[in-house]
């Protein structure tokens, strides 16, 4: 005589919490499974990473054309010749901090055209 799903549900509904815990343990042993909650893979909503809005432009190296890079740094930062030269020769150095992505990309492009190696962080 096979039990219907309805009969099984009624039998489970009549049990106490302690009896249900024992029943679950018996199922785990009999079928060699675990009743632990399965971790659900994080979806896009769960991984709501805040997009970076402020960037730093770092001069990594000045490359082969140091004079052109110094001119580009002076133009971008408004520094004097000596300060710009010291900054370029002291690479890696942060040229600008807390700027927008667009401004950072534009500055990076100008410096790379002058021969520098630049990173946007």
From Swiss-Prot:
Lineage top rank: taxon: Bacteria
GO MF annotations, alphabetized: mRNA binding; structural constituent of ribosome
Intrachain S-S bonds: none
Quaternary context: Homodimer. Part of the ribosomal stalk of the 50S ribosomal subunit. Forms a multimeric L10(L12)X complex, where L10 forms an elongated spine to which 2 to 4 L12 dimers bind in a sequential fashion. Binds GTP-bound translation factors.
Function: Forms part of the ribosomal stalk which helps the ribosome interact with GTP-bound translation factors. Is thus essential for accurate translation.
Family: Belongs to the bacterial ribosomal protein bL12 family.
Name of protein: Large ribosomal subunit protein bL12
Taxonomic source organism: Acinetobacter baylyi (strain ATCC 33305 / BD413 / ADP1)
């Amino acid at each position: 005589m096979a039990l219907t799903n309805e009969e099984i549900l009624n039998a489970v509904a009549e049990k106490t919490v302690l009896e249900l815990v024992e029943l679950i343990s018996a199922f785990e042993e009999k079928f060699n499974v675990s009743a632990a909650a399965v971790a659900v893979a994080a979806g896009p909503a769960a991984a709501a990473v805040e997009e970076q809005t402020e960037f730093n432009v770092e001069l990594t190296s000045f490359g082969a054309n140091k004079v052109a890079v110094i001119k580009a740094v002076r133009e971008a930062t408004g520094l004097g010749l000596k300060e710009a030269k010291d900054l370029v020769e002291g690479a890696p150095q942060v040229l600008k901090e807390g700027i927008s992505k667009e401004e950072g990309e534009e500055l990076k492009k100008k410096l790379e055209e002058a021969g520098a190696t630049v990173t946007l962080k």
